[in-house]
Each structure stands twice: as structure tokens, then as C-alpha cells.
Amino acid sequence: MLEALRGIVGNKGLITDPTEMEPWITDWRQRRRGRALAVVQPASTQEVSAVVALCAAEGQPVFPVGGNTGLCFGAVPESDRQDRPGVVLSLRRMNRIRATDRATGIATVDAGVVLGDLHNAAIEAGRQFPLHLGSEGSAQIGGLISTNAGGTGVVRYGPMRDLVAGLEVVLADGRVLTDLAALRKDNTGYMLRHLFIGAEGTLGIITGAALRLHPQTPNTAHAWVSVISPAAAVALFAALQDRAGSYIQAFELVSAPQFELVRRHAERARFPFPEIPAWSVLIELGSEDATTALPAILEEVVGAALERGEVRDAVVATSEQQASEFWHIRHSVSEANKKEGIGIVLDIAVRSSDVAPFIAAAAAVAAERYPQAVSQVVCHLGDGNVHVILMFQRDFWATLPDEDPFALEVERAIHDVAARFGGTFSAEHGVGRKLTEELERLADPLRYELMTKVKALFDPQNLMNPGVLLAPKAA
């Protein structure tokens, strides 16, 4: 098997040394470790096809990995059989931007392209790719599509699904499905690409994508706003929608405990307020038109909220440098939490109108059942995505006889609160291996049944990232 793989990808495309493999089989937060026969790094779609066909013939699972920035262990290789550990398939060497078309606003790229590199290529083409998140320096396009990533710009541009115009996918038997025409109109039946977006590598391996670029918005305005409560933040968002709805590019709510951790651990962070507010909102407006007075609009809306008593303080950025510093605070959340302790990150989505009561209900449950934890909130308020983070100290975590059942118990407690509001337990992070039981427990039974049938149709041997998304017995 190893020699056959070497014959496909060459020596530099195959890693078998256990020490060198370690970063590929362990999640980035060092919480879960898998095993694999080898790490395979193809350099082309044809090589991916040959690798997958070989694995299908040998009955070996294929575990795709992108930038390994996920939070649900979807890239950790875990086989259900000792005799078939499977291979990790990394598309790191497939990092070519194949084409950018300014006329159509389409960039065609390899799946291993890093998000930050795509941002730069889009700017060079006079456009922008509007997906932004804290891991954009390492997250890869294939993984972002496979998890239908969200980020801070969903309120204006939608999640990754809305930015994908076409895909190239290697199926479980090695055949290549090519759908990169990126036509605006195409009514020729099922749009199969949507099955692979958010499938977390369980139906095939994404090797290329046609992505929608957007006009640049060089005219921007940014502010950190101290609000009295989540309800006040919701009211501020509604007022901003009325006045400048088409300009809103981000509206991020952060709780005081989370702000404090960023201040404690983030390097080079400069904070806008002398004291940490109970709740604060990072707002970004953007326009293609340089004449639109965005700072004035922002000051008008925030000023009215200040008069209503919903806002305590606000700082509007007066330079690009200050705006960058604002975003540095927001994008430092994950690393700050990693340094602080063990955070159980909930990825809830509810209707925007339910954000405030959900946060209150979740905080009440957390305080009653888990007093050892500090409850933190980071919320993409514009799209209703609430990250409740229960932060436990490492000393407490070390006393647990078994971490996984406890973590699942905590997650279920908050998931049940979300369910009462008609929300979902996975807004943008995916399901991975971490939440397969929760998907089976909370999903509509018919929807879940149909998902298992789709999996069986595309991957009858269950070799594509087995154990991810669907519970093993269901797949």
C-alpha cells in the first residue's frame, strides 16, 4: 500500500515517520489524537483521484485535512478497524489560484489555497473575497467549503455556501465530478455541488472551487460600542439596519469575560475603552462609493442609541490602523481562550430577535449546573450565531475521570436551551466527530434518514471520513 502511494505522489508527497505525522493526526488544540497509515499530499486532482481509487480498492479510509483549524475534530483520523487505519489526505500542495475573472467575478482555485492568499489574489484582481475569520492565515478553501464556514461577514455576504459557484470533487471510487462552469443560470436538474458543501468530507474530496468575488468596499467605518445589554445590542442592530442595512459588514457582540481574556492574553492588542464594558459591539460598515458618509451614519445611529440609554460609550476608528486594531481584538478570541484554559465552545444559531433571551437562558443554566465555569459570549449578532463558551480551569479539568462524557453533558445542556428557541446546535463549526450523537438526537428523523441514504449512495464502503457527521451505526 505504501509503495503504491509513493508511486502516485512521490517521496515528497508521502509522510510515514510517526513524529512528522503528529501534527496531521492531532487537532490544533491538542485535545484529540488519531492514527493513520500515512499522510498523503497529492499535487494535482489526478493524483487525488489515483490515491482515492487505490484506497477504495484496498478498503482503506480516507481522512481529508485542510488547515486543521476546526473545532469539532472533523479532521482527526479515527478508523473503526485496527486493520485499516486509513490515510490522511492533505491538499497542502494543491495551492494554485487557477484563474481570476474580473468580468464574471469568479476565482477558480485549488482546494489547498489558504484563505489569506485568496484575499490577496482577489485584491490584485480589483475585487474582494468576503469570508473573514480568525484563522484565515491557515484555513484552506477545501476545508472551509466542507464545513460551510461562516465568519464575521455572513450578515452581508452569507456563509461559504453562498460564495461557491462551482466545485471539482473526487468521488469515493476515484472518479472526478467537474462542475466549474460557474454559470449564473443553470436549470439542468439537481445542483449536486450543494451536497458537498457542509458534508465535511464524507461524500468526496473537494479538489477545486469556483468562488464568487465581490466588489471592494474601500470606504469603511468601524466602531467599538459599549451597550448596556444584549437586548440593547439587538435594538442597535435593528436601528442600524433601518438607516444603513446594505452597508453592514459585521456586527459582533462580545461579553466582558471574553473581552477580559483577550486583554490578558492577546499580544499587541490596544483596547478602545479604559474599563471593560459589560457588553460591547464591534461594527463595520462598508461601501463601494467613496462619497458615502459612513462615519457620520454610524455616529448618528449610535448617538441616538446613547440618548435612549442603550449605549454607554463608543469609539469610532479614525484611521485604518485603528480599525485594524479593533479587528485584532475580535480575531484574538480563539487563541486567548486556548491560553486561558479548557473552553467548551457552543455554536448556536437562533433568530436574531431571540438572541438576548437565549443568552440569558443559557447563562442561567450554566450558572446553576456548572458554577466552576466562567460563561463567555461571542456573537455574530447580525445572523443570530451565538458562541457560548464555558471556560474551565485546567486544574478542574484534570480532576475529571473522563472528559468526553462531561463535555457532552455540558454541550447538551446548552443545546437543549437552543432547541427551546427553535435554534440549531451547529451554526458554522460543523458536526465533526464531536457532535454526531447530538445530530442524531436533535435532527428531524426523516431528514436524518435521508442524510444516511445520501451517504450510502455516494460512499457505499463508508471510506470517506468515516465517523464524521453521521454516527457510525447510522452511516
Which stretches of residues belong to each language-model region?
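Noncatalytic alpha-helical scaffold of FAD-dependent oxidoreductases
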Residues: 1-475
